[in-house]
From Swiss-Prot:
<dbReference type="InterPro" id="IPR050085">
    <property type="entry name" value="NAGSA_dehydrogenase"/>
</dbReference>
<dbReference type="Pfam" id="PF22698">
    <property type="entry name" value="Semialdhyde_dhC_1"/>
</dbReference>
<keyword id="KW-0963">Cytoplasm</keyword>
<dbReference type="GO" id="GO:0051287">
    <property type="term" value="F:NAD binding"/>
</dbReference>
<comment type="function">
    <text>Catalyzes the NADPH-dependent reduction of N-acetyl-5-glutamyl phosphate to yield N-acetyl-L-glutamate 5-semialdehyde.</text>
</comment>
<dbReference type="GO" id="GO:0003942">
    <property type="term" value="F:N-acetyl-gamma-glutamyl-phosphate reductase activity"/>
</dbReference>
<comment type="similarity">
    <text>Belongs to the NAGSA dehydrogenase family. Type 1 subfamily.</text>
</comment>
<keyword id="KW-0028">Amino-acid biosynthesis</keyword>
<dbReference type="InterPro" id="IPR036291">
    <property type="entry name" value="NAD(P)-bd_dom_sf"/>
</dbReference>
<dbReference type="InterPro" id="IPR000534">
    <property type="entry name" value="Semialdehyde_DH_NAD-bd"/>
</dbReference>
<dbReference type="InterPro" id="IPR023013">
    <property type="entry name" value="AGPR_AS"/>
</dbReference>
<comment type="pathway">
    <text>Amino-acid biosynthesis; L-arginine biosynthesis; N(2)-acetyl-L-ornithine from L-glutamate: step 3/4.</text>
</comment>
<keyword id="KW-0521">NADP</keyword>
<dbReference type="GO" id="GO:0070401">
    <property type="term" value="F:NADP+ binding"/>
</dbReference>
<dbReference type="InterPro" id="IPR000706">
    <property type="entry name" value="AGPR_type-1"/>
</dbReference>
<keyword id="KW-0560">Oxidoreductase</keyword>
<dbReference type="GO" id="GO:0005737">
    <property type="term" value="C:cytoplasm"/>
</dbReference>
Amino acid sequence: MKNIAIIGASGYTGAQLTALVHAESELSIQGLYVSENSLDKGRALADLYPVYSHIELTLSPLTEEAKANIVAEADAVVLATEHSVSLHLAAWFYSQGLAVFDLSGAYRFSDVAQYPKWYGFEHEYPEVLAKAVYGLAEWNAKDVAATKMIAVPGCYPTASLTALKPLKNLLTSAYPVINAVSGVTGAGRKAQLHTSFCEVSLTPYGVLGHRHQPEIATQLGQEVIFTPHLGNFKRGILATITVQLKPGTTTADVAAAYSVYDQAPLVTVKQNQFPKVDDVVLTPNCHLGWKFDESSGYLVVASAIDNLMKGAASQALQCIKIHFNL
């Protein structure tokens, strides 16, 4: 039995992860934590999310005493916190010998020079960053098992990279073009006018400047054009990607490339059939659908995930189970 502490448990991702860990027979929850100044401290999780009424746990403030208890009692800590908060907490818990699964972007780039541009802070822990592994579960399982510092990928990168990585050896130098739509839960639980459901209308945002673009490009090893969109639905992501493949590539070559997922139980691949968000919501699955035009060399692949599950909480759980060989 492995004991897991969850910090940032009041948010959508933290609460979803709590439910997933609670359902695992080989995992237990050491505690649920929020910041000391959170208005949710002392409240039951079920007060915030009645759907989790079967989970009788309270949100505790992350005091120094609480941190000491986590170190003494937990095997791992999951951080569902802001990037700048995770930056410090991840380094501290790692230094105490715990396995750290960070859902923020604070450890996703190995290059410290990326952080001021994309996250607005200087990275203060290069020695910890050097140990971090990018937790794209289907691709980096060996590294996830071998390290105690796991950076869980972003939601858009998970959808995009799951679709693109099998094609790496077939791509030309032309940039893949990624158009992705996410539900409003991707913006978090904090009240904001532009993410109020009555205000949301399908629209692009972060055009040619979203921080997930360099994350995707770094992990793919090739630049991409990435345009996210905010959709008027609660949860889920659909990424539709257009790529140019090398001259002479055949449909059989593409099928062979995607056969890498034949033994991946959470990834479903279909040729000439395209996924929809409803089929993956509330699941840990990724559904891929592709079609290739041999005459032009262009391929379109669509990737559907639940942004709170495969794009965050369930992928964190995958990494936990991989790391502890569960």
